[in-house]
Amino acid sequence: MTSSPTGNNGDLATLYPVMTSPLRFCVLGDSLAAGVGSSREDDTLGRRLARRLRDAGHPVHLRNFGVPGARSADLERQVGVALGEGVDLALIVIGANDLAGFVAPAVGARQLQDAVTRLVRAGARVIVVPAPDLGIVARVPGPYRQLVSAASGHYAQAQTEAAIRAGGAVATAGPELAARFAADPALFSADRFHPSSAGYAVIADGLAPHVLDAARHLAA
């Protein structure tokens, strides 16, 4: 599964292991996973991260199973399809619709844990991107933003703990990313809810180190 990148003379020290067969990279989750709000398909998270992987020397076979409006309960079906086609690395972006639909954190976290467990048992590396801070969304009335942000953080924490219990890794957005989106309207699309192409670029930059690290471990 690995090769040893060397210099032109073939005798330099190995830098990083890379995949020699295509890395089966699957993106699962909701509208953020699907790329709603981006101007072009090439600007979606999956496409951007696949390019990062290829630039690092990993051949990639990308499949996107994200569905707008999906909640954690929908991961069961998405995971089933992904496993049927084969998956080495899975990126799960989920939680915003659970929050909007008032799904209890314990319920959504359990559904996420079940999904991650199935993928890990099948030999996949799994990276979970927890629920975003919905308090920064313009359509949330000002007086409620602090409350919504607190609920978002509570939900994301439950997801984080569930993903780790199941053997997955977690790529949290953190307050810095939320602050960046809150300060720059250009990072949102016209609906003022989903990221724009520029917003997806910012998110992909934050996720890339996690994805590349997972690929290196798979190739080792």
Identify the residue ranges that each predicted region occupies:
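Alpha-helical cap/lid subdomain in secreted, periplasmic
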Residues: 76-220
